[in-house]
Design a protein with these regions (language model features):
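Acidic, surface-exposed loops and disordered segments
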Residues: 1-170
Length: 170
């Protein structure tokens, strides 16, 4: 698939089959993430693969809404950074997250970005602290996102180019 078709086909997928993601697919996803651009080539990003069902279920509760899809995903990739490497860690992690999403589509997998940074629960707990606790992530790391990944349970139509917001181009 060429790039134009890839970005048109890529959609957020929130329902998955029970089919596992293969080790080869996982490696391709991580390879793409590790090739993402980073500020001054410092690569402040780090990744954690989560396949454990109990951990995925716990991660699905890190916010009050919008995270339940993690419980049914075959896996998730947590995208985080060591902010002591660069103050541009958010941008580095966002690039890596986007590369994971595009690679997933290229592999025929479904994926959805789950925002962690600056999100939380109504009781005041931050999503980031919950994720760090579940996965024993170092306290000084910052978690930007998680990507829920699996085989698509329901296909989605490609992006409709007629709905592009060209008036947003100034």
């Amino acid at each position: 698939m060429d790039f134009k078709d890839l970005i048109k086909q890529r959609r957020s997928i929130r329902t998955f089959t029970s089919e596992p993601v293969t080790p080869e697919e996982e490696r391709a996803l991580l390879r793409a993430a590790l090739m993402a651009p980073s500020s001054k080539g410092k690569h402040s990003y780090f990744f954690k693969v989560v396949r454990d069902r109990e951990q995925l279920a716990a991660l699905s509760q890190c916010r009050d809404a919008g995270t339940q899809l993690l419980a049914d995903a075959a896996m998730a990739i947590v995208v985080m950074a060591d902010p002591s490497i660069t103050d541009i860690w958010v941008e580095d992690c966002a690039s890596a997250t986007s590369y994971i999403l595009l690679q997933a589509e290229d592999l025929g997998l479904g994926a959805c970005w789950v925002q962690v940074h600056s999100r939380g629960k109504e009781d005041g707990r931050s999503a980031q602290e919950i994720v760090k606790d579940v996965l024993s992530i170092p306290a000084d790391y910052q978690v930007l996102s998680m990507v829920a990944i699996g085989h698509k349970a329901v296909p989605r139509n490609p992006q409709n180019e007629d709905k592009l917001l060209w008036d947003h181009v100034l």
